[in-house]
Swiss-Prot record:
GO cellular component, one term: cytoplasm
Gene Ontology MF, one: ATP binding
Stated name of the protein: DNA replication and repair protein RecF
GO BP, one annotated term: double-strand break repair
Amino acid sequence: MSLQRISIESFRNIAAANLLPSEGLNLIYGHNGSGKTSVLEAIYFLGMGRSFRSHLSQRVIRHDEDKLTLFAQLSHHNGESKVGLRRHRNGEIEVKIDGDRVKRLSTLAETLPIQVITPESFSLLFEGPKARRQFVDWGAFHSDEQFYTAWSNVKRILKQRNQLLRNGSSYGNILFWDKELVRYAEQVTQIRNHYVDSLNELLKGIIEEFLPQVNISISFTRGWDSKTDLALLLESQYSRDLATGHTVSGPHKADLRLRVGNLPVQDALSRGQLKLLVCALRIAQGKLLKQQKDKQSIYLVDDLPSELDAQHRQLLLKQLTETGAQIFVTAIEPAAIVDSLASPPNKVFHVEQGRVTVIE
């Protein structure tokens, strides 16, 4: 999987840009505010239908335009595909894959699997469980085709159940939804568990490279006591749920626990070590996708020199290039990346005031 051509129009400060990236490592450099991160953001937007920097997608549309347009031609093990996305300031979004209109943004994610390593992505360990659930669910979505439907049903049922709780409904009116919730919760949990088990096997070797002599254990918690039947728990917690107006236990409370001995990694490791652990998690996820589905991820790595020292930059870039995946890396100074590579970047782009040029 690699992007052969990328077209960006009216995205942040980029009026128009066309890139013909390499299948290997692409270095994008420029001053702060030049638009180099916007190139990565545009690629992510094309794959996810949203930004990794802002929940308000309208903000990514260039200030003097009413819509943005993104297009990419990509090659994969089944041949080639063309992906296009147009986002209007009023929120309307149009997506086409090989000329056909696509209604679900999940189809984009399936077509263009993207891994992001940015200053924001370190929230995976520094913040609450939501980011870790999203990490697990990215992998579960790509590894098992039944996950998306099951998880969509869980979210739909929880929304209905929570509305009934806020309306003060009796448990008799909620019982039907509980039976449905239990059914899909078990399916979601089984897929998540299986995915984390598979990820663990790959992760051990990568962590040994990044953090030698640090013994990290990883476990998945499903969102309720593993010894308790969810149906019985939902019934016993009805009064509590009624008081809070939402469902306290269930698959929406799942988490990925990472520990060193008896301590959470957040308490046992330095901030630099935690960043390396996040990088290891992202690389393992990409490797597992390749192993399970013969599909490469595309890696977007933003502002690497400000996040890792030279030694660890070198280690991360070595691990990334060894995956064989297409990589886009940004930096203010190209030397910060070039000096950390065993061989020169496959392609170099310079960005200045939203204009992207290739450096021969």
